[in-house]
């Protein structure tokens, strides 16, 4: 009978393990900002500006949604204006047909 010597083969890592981290991800972009430009004609209900908080205030014929989104109440031309010294507002002025 043949007797075979079996080698005791053990493999070890030749590099340290990578470990884990609590970083390495990012949130989805929320697509905030101006959705209509100054001088642009919009219809009633059109979104003018998406924001968190009141970065820009609603002016004439502009409403503010529950998430502070500004929208046009009537069809007209968009105007971004100053409100006092340090605030801005957006208004929609109807055009004569």
From Swiss-Prot:
Paired cysteines (S-S): none
Entry's family note: Belongs to the bacterial ribosomal protein bL27 family.
Region spans: Disordered: 14-37
HAMAP family: Ribosomal_bL27 (MF_00539)
Keywords (A to Z) from UniProt: Ribonucleoprotein, Ribosomal protein
Protein name, per record: Large ribosomal subunit protein bL27
Short name of any one Pfam family annotated for the protein: Ribosomal_L27
Propeptide: 1-12
InterPro entries reported for this sequence: Ribosomal_bL27, Ribosomal_bL27_CS
Assigned GO CC terms: cytosolic large ribosomal subunit
A Gene Ontology molecular function term of the record: structural constituent of ribosome
GO biological process: translation
Post-translational modification: The N-terminus is cleaved by ribosomal processing cysteine protease Prp.
């Amino acid at each position: 009978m043949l007797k075979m010597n079996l080698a005791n083969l053990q493999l070890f890592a030749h590099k340290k393990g990578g470990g884990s981290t609590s970083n390495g991800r990012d949130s989805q972009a929320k697509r905030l900002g101006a959705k209509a430009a100054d001088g642009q004609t919009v219809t009633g209900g059109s979104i003018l500006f998406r924001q968190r908080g009141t970065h820009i205030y609603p002016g004439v014929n502009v409403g503010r949604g529950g998430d502070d989104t500004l929208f046009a109440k009537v069809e007209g031309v968009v105007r971004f204006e100053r409100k006092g010294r340090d605030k801005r507002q957006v208004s929609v002025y109807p055009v004569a047909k």
